[in-house]
Curated annotation (Swiss-Prot):
The lineage of its organism: Bacteria, Pseudomonadati, Campylobacterota, Epsilonproteobacteria, Campylobacterales. Disulfide bonds: none annotated. The keyword Membrane applies. InterPro entries: Membr_insert_effic_factor_YidD. Belongs to the UPF0161 family. Could be involved in insertion of integral membrane proteins into the membrane. It is a peripheral membrane protein. This is Putative membrane protein insertion efficiency factor. It is found in: Cell inner membrane. GO terms for cellular component: plasma membrane. Keywords: Cell inner membrane, Cell membrane, Membrane.
């Protein structure tokens, strides 16, 4: 399910966000009004979205983080095709994978999911 279309661009954005978290955000007090934080929101979104469309959603999220916004819980959303039952269970006996994210369907449509990290 992860984004493999442009791994180089995703890797650059992910490395820059992780650098921000490690070197800048660690030395400032926690001030994000949302859960997940804006940097975690960006990392989660980069796993599932095209990096350019993810950057648009990340920019909207950062612009909404201001004193006039009350904040709260705002999970990132993505649009995915639901795999057929045969596709989702074909490697069941061979490969056990660790669950990293839950994709919870939204009420908006059948292809839009909330991304929630386990």
């Amino acid at each position: 399910m992860r984004n493999n279309k442009t791994p180089f661009l995703s890797a650059i954005f992910t490395a820059s966000i992780r650098g921000y978290q490690r070197f800048f955000s660690a030395f400032t007090p926690s001030s994000c009004r949302f859960y997940p934080t804006c940097s975690n929101y960006a990392l989660w979104l980069l796993c599932f979205e095209n990096p350019l469309s993810a950057m648009g959603k990340i920019a909207i999220r950062i612009l909404s983080c201001n004193p006039f916004c009350s904040g709260g819980i705002a999970y990132p959303t993505t649009r995915l095709k639901r795999p057929s039952l045969l596709q989702s269970h074909k490697d069941f006996n061979r490969n056990f994978k660790t669950i990293t994210f839950w994709l919870v369907p939204t009420t908006k449509s059948r292809t839009t999911y909330y991304i929630i990290k386990v």
